[in-house]
Amino acid sequence: MVRPSKTANVLQRVRECLNLGRYYDTSHASERKALRNITLPHVLYVLKNGCHEKKKDEFKPEYNDWTYAIRGRTIDGRDIRIAVAFDEKNMLIITAIEIKGSQR
């Protein structure tokens, strides 16, 4: 199977999906957010205002697709990384993690 190309402008695509309401949590993201006390408003704020961490993007052979890392600070100052992927029209929120210390 041929590896698909990465999405060219990840932040633009993320923000388009947010503006159109075309995003949803995977079950993994819902579980991890609850465990880590990360709320949907935290996630949305980081996705709207964060930066694309290209070095943290990963190809997932089991899905034959890429996940993209968006990182930023929440309004209350938490350093959060969100992993997202895209299907035809939507953005899937894969997971959310709080970064402690310097993991840039």
Short names for language-model regions:
Residues 1-104:
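Ribonuclease/tRNase effector modules and their secretory precursors
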